[in-house]
Amino acid sequence: MNTPYTDSYDRAFLLDTMMGPNAMRLTEELVAQLPIAPGMRILDLGCGKGISSILLAEKYDATVFAADLWITPDENAARFSERGLDGKIFPLRVDATKEIPFAHDYFDLIVSVDAYQYFGNNDVMLGTLLPFLKPGGHIAVAVPGFIGEYSETHLPDVVKPF
C-alpha cells in the first residue's frame, strides 16, 4: 500500500484507536485517486473511533461528519479536540439502518471503512445513501477481505489466530 501519511503517523495513537484493520491506512489508500479538495463535506459512515475522519480532516482539510452507532460522540469529540480538530470533525451517533439525519445533496463524498459490511449488506443501502451526495459526488467503501481463496488447511500464519 502507498500510505505515506499513515506511515509517518503516531503509531501509539493508531494502535490505541484501531478497532480492527488500520482504518487510517485503508482510508488513505481508498481515497488517493478521488478529487478531494479543501472544504469538502465528507460523511464518514461507521467511523468507529474516528481515525479515518482524522486523516480526511488533517490531510485533505475537509469538513468531516464522523457518524457511528457504537462509539459515543462525546468520546470521539474528545479525541478530535486533543488533535486540534474542533470545527473540522463533527461526531454524531447515527444508525445507518434507520433514518440518516442529513439534507439531500449535502456531501461531496461518503466513505465507509471496515463498517459497510455491518449495515450495507443489502440491496437498498447504496440507493439510500445516493440522495445525500451532491451531483458528481462519490461513495467509497472498503471492507475486509482476502486477495485470494484459502482452504482451512492452507491459511497464512498471520490469520490462523483469528
Q: What do these predicted regions represent?
A:
Residues M1-R11:
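N-terminal, positively charged/glycine-rich alpha-helical extensions of SAM-dependent methyltransferases
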Residues L43, K49-K98:
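Class I SAM-dependent methyltransferase SAM/SAH-binding core
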Residues P144-F162:
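Short, glycine-/aromatic-enriched active-site segment of Class I SAM-dependent methyltransferases
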Residues G20-P38:
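Conserved alpha-helix/loop element of class I SAM-dependent methyltransferases that forms part
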Residues Y9-N22:
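Class I SAM-dependent methyltransferase Rossmann-like catalytic core
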Residues D123-H138:
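A short glycine-rich, Lys/Arg-flanked "PGG" loop and its adjoining helix->strand segment in the class I
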